[in-house]
Amino acid sequence: MPIIGVQLHIQDTHVMIDNGILQLTLSNPDGIVTGIRYNDIDNLLEVVNEESNRGYWDLVWNSPGSTGTTGSFDVIKGTSFNVIVEEEDQVEVSFNRSWGSSQESKLVPLNIDKRFIVLRGCSGFYSYAIFEHLKDWPGFTLAETRLAFKLRKDKFRYMAMADNRQRYLPLPDDRLPGRGQALAYPEAVLLVNPVEPQFKGEVDDKYQYSCDNKDSQVHGWICTDEPAVGFWMITPSNEFRSGGPVKQNLTSHVGPTTLAVFLSAHYSGEDLVPKFSAGEAWKKVFGPVFMYLNSAMEGEDPVWLWEDAKQQMGIEVESWPYTFPASDDFPKSNQRGKLSGRLIVKDRYVSHENIAANRGYIGLGPPGNAGSWQRECKNYQFWTNTDVNGYFVINDVRAGDYNLYAWVPGFIGDYQSAALITIAPGIEIEVGDLIYEPPRNGPTLWEIGIPDRSAAEFYVPDPNSNYINPLYVNHPHRFRQYGLWERYAELYPDGDVVYTVGTSDYKKDWFFAQVTRQDFVF
């Protein structure tokens, strides 16, 4: 049976795109995703929510000179709708919001073009957005931007984000007063009277499902009703995310909510809030990301959908950069460049021979100082890992001027290239051997832990038994349990940790986080 072509249906207040597998409905001209029909489910999105609270791009912004990470929350609504591509193989539509001086102090001074793409035979849809600030516009700060989907709570109960991080989650109702007890911050709630008693006594906290950018390429939800259905957020590249590969961001959490976070100050603070001045021109493409839908045959284990989503993620990664986005602001592979070389560590106190940078992190980022990539949040970054011999290839880099940055697990400090590297379309640059000399004043006398930027080797205590997420019991991510900061003073009531070199074991004797003590006043 031939695969039917993609059809576009335009109405006064809605736009519907149908490829025979799914029907995607968006408000016109707002560009809010109001409906996703798939596999005989009329709408995967939460139908009890207002249409503007189902699938949307949003941001948090503030006036120039403001400090902190808060500001005005804005669900981005378009003011004009345009058809960019309408063919049997592809439909791409645009919902644009233009800024004018009459909107000063009311809206963030950005032109925002939200795009949605449906392809023939494709079980899902793509979205990306183009943000542009013109040179003569006023300044602003941008604390956050993301794409959010609110799924049906009566359907999607099983969340998966990694092979060892997946579980049934409670209902959003369980977080409300009477069923949930607020804890130290609003996101953390103790479930005292949940609708389903098996969740009683658990802590629900969306931050417990955060993930490093480098590890957050697919996450989402499974509806276990037969036939089972999955909804997945696939991020095929990290080039448009801020903060580098070890920046943590939110993923999926109780709602059921699924996020693609492009820019966020979570876990970092104001350093990761870009500040734009008057007279500063800026443009950035966030995405595309892929919302993948899959279904299981009757009788199949619904968790198979997670395995299938991982396979699809691999396909999307291999397809990057996509060939089909119509915007000229998204360069295709032949409009990008490539960099290759080898990273070597030179440390005579470890070895008289050069040391291959085994599984080091190396990336191109905007010009700056060593380590500045961690705070860079306006432009693009391109990261990869070296192999066991230190060799690396960074493919499909946007044209421009960059510094090359790196760090190597097992060695302290940051590498930075001495000179700028200019990437040009279609050009491959071979930089040869790069030498990194870690900073030191002499031989290592002693050290606590392993310099790999994870703290995974240190002592993580068991949580208070009253505040447990069962997912993280005896788990590599047990540091995500609620309230561990309070355990420090309980374990060391008379003073801070005393670590004795040569006797103490950092796996047992060094608390994984440096936290303040609670001061009690009677």
What are these regions (language model features)?
Residues 48-91, 160-183:
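Structured domain cores in non-transmembrane regions
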